[in-house]
Amino acid sequence: MSLSLWQQCLARLQDELPATEFSMWIRPLQAELSDNTLALYAPNRFVLDWVRDKYLNNINGLLNTFCGADAPQLRFEVGTKPVTQTLKTPVHNVVAPAQTTTAQPQRVAPAARSGWDNVPAPAEPTYRSNVNVKHTFDNFVEGKSNQLARAAARQVADNPGGAYNPLFLYGGTGLGKTHLLHAVGNGIMARKPNAKVVYMHSERFVQDMVKALQNNAIEEFKRYYRSVDALLIDDIQFFANKERSQEEFFHTFNALLEGNQQIILTSDRYPKEINGVEDRLKSRFGWGLTVAIEPPELETRVAILMKKADENDIRLPGEVAFFIAKRLRSNVRELEGALNRVIANANFTGRAITIDFVREALRDLLALQEKLVTIDNIQKTVAEYYKIKIADLLSKRRSRSVARPRQMAMALAKELTNHSLPEIGDAFGGRDHTTVLHACRKIEQLREESHDIKEDFSNLIRTLSS
């Protein structure tokens, strides 16, 4: 038995697991086989616990499949394996273009100073962190929609410049991307108080560069941005069509990556879908780990409301939290804004927070939401998205090109409206409520297994909620 056994396991796990999961949890593992024991080394305790909790059965199952009664015992360790043997992950890439296929520009070491030895060195720049201390991992409400993003961000905070560099988070407005950026910054500085961590919106980078050009201070600009320990840039899509800014950021990106300095970027869309940004930049955005943040599901929306109320020392009855969460679905910011309005109204009037009170306090917001998201609107949007006719969604046709969009539309109707399953079934050609339930479960399963279905669902949610 040899280390090729782990190669076989990796190949199977890569086929069986979603690409993001494999890249995040399995790819960082190192293996050592000796005395009928397969030791798997994880980069930190967090990864070790996650793999042991989530994938232990998968790995043991594969060992039994390949070795039968001779399957080695599995042991987990934190750290790196002895360097006497090297084991490489299969070459085929799962999340982003392999770095070996695109040569990274090499940073040229500064030449010897020679006759310039007596010239004073440039002053150390003063770093403006801009990290909001209020946004931490502790007050970030985790749910199925953001679990992977939070886990990746946590690892980056614990090990900046390590496995996930750059980390690219994308998703709609108000879903928690900015919160995670600040949480990473706070996490890094908690471990290393003197760390040079800089958070900014992409437009600030552009403004700083323009100012540097105007003041003939571009070298100071470069020195500032290329000497940080972690650069956290929000809404990178605003670099679109700003060629000079993209050029400068391209070189900054390369310098930071070569120096093992952490880069985290956020956007409202997948890197390859950002228009107006050079392909060489979009390619680099995907070099590390790319993770989506989706709109929060009902349970997470309720948890967000309850936590926000608790932070404000407000008692929010559970049934009221469910009432709000079932009607406001698009993003966290909308939820928190609605709750702030409810709290303000309660403080002004001295009334208890009940469902009737919330219905009155949020009547315009709730009316607008119900007007925007209807089953008819969902059917129209889904039909346009998949380039089929609404009549196809209502028909008895069962071909996949029609059945899958129909299931998607039913799942969206359950998620975004307050209609019952029988009502949804009636709206789709008089179908039974069990058909709707099957469609919802099927789409939920496919969102776990298929990146394309997951993207379709997120895109449609974003379109319908905007």
From Swiss-Prot:
Region named Domain IV, binds dsDNA: 347-466
Subcellular location: Cytoplasm
Pfam family, one: DnaA_N
Record Gene3D superfamilies: 1.10.1750.10, 1.10.8.60, 3.30.300.180, P-loop containing nucleotide triphosphate hydrolases
Region described as Domain I, interacts with DnaA modulators: spans on this chain: 1-86
Family listed: Belongs to the DnaA family.
Assembly and binders: Oligomerizes as a right-handed, spiral filament on DNA at oriC.
Xref: HAMAP family: DnaA_bact
Function: Plays an essential role in the initiation and regulation of chromosomal replication. ATP-DnaA binds to the origin of replication (oriC) to initiate formation of the DNA replication initiation complex once per cell cycle. Binds the DnaA box (a 9 base pair repeat at the origin) and separates the double-stranded (ds)DNA. Forms a right-handed helical filament on oriC DNA; dsDNA binds to the exterior of the filament while single-stranded (ss)DNA is stabiized in the filament's interior.
UniProt domain comment: Domain I is involved in oligomerization and binding regulators, domain II is flexibile and of varying length in different bacteria, domain III forms the AAA+ region, while domain IV binds dsDNA.
Annotated protein name in UniProt: Chromosomal replication initiator protein DnaA
